[in-house]
Amino acid sequence: MSDTDELLEATTALILPLLHALDALNQAGRLMHPPALQEVVSAIGPYRDPLEEGRQVFTQVQWPEHLEAFTLHANMATTLALRAFDGFASAMDQAEPPMAAYRAMGLATQAYAAAYPLAAMLPPMNRFYLENDAREDEELQRKLMEADTEQPNVGVMHADNASDQRGGFSVYVPEYYQGETLPLVVALHGGSGHGRQFLWSWLRAV
C-alpha cells in the first residue's frame, strides 16, 4: 500500500464515523427533553464505538507535516465527540441526569466547532454544516469549497467572547462573502447560555 493510499484509508476510517457521530449528537440536542433522556441516550449510543475504532486507525498513521491542521482538528473533534457520548451514557447515573446531559451537549457543541475547519477541506464535512435541503445545493457547496477561508473578516469570529467571558458576541460571515449586501441575523441565547456555543445551533440556517 502506498503512503497516499494509507492516508486515504485512515481518513475514510475516521471521517465517515465522525460525520455519523456528529449528526447523532446534533439530533440528540434537537430531541433533548428530560423525560425522554433514556430514549435519546439509547438512540445515539451505537455511534460511539465506530468512532473510537476509526480514531484508532487514524492515529496509527504517520501523517505528513503539511496535513498537521487537518489531523489536529480531526483529532480534537473526535476526542470531544467521544467525551460527549460518554457524558450522555453516564447521565442516567448522575444525581441530576438532565444537567449531566446538558453538559454532554456542551461537549458536542465544542466538537462541532473543532471540526468546522475540516469543512473547507472535505465536501462531506462541508455538507454537515448545511441544512438538509441545502445539502443538495451544488452551487452553494461549490461556493463554500472554493472560498478563500484565509481572507479577513469571514467565517466564525468571536469578539470578547471566550467561554469564561460575558458581554461579547460571536458572528458568522459566509466565507464566500465579497462585499455584497447581505441580511443581518441576530440570535439571542438567553441568560443561561453562551453565544460562543449558541452560534452552532443556528449557523446551518444562515
Residues of each region from the PLM?
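A domain-start/cap signature at the N-terminus of enzymes
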Residues: 1-53, 60, 66-182
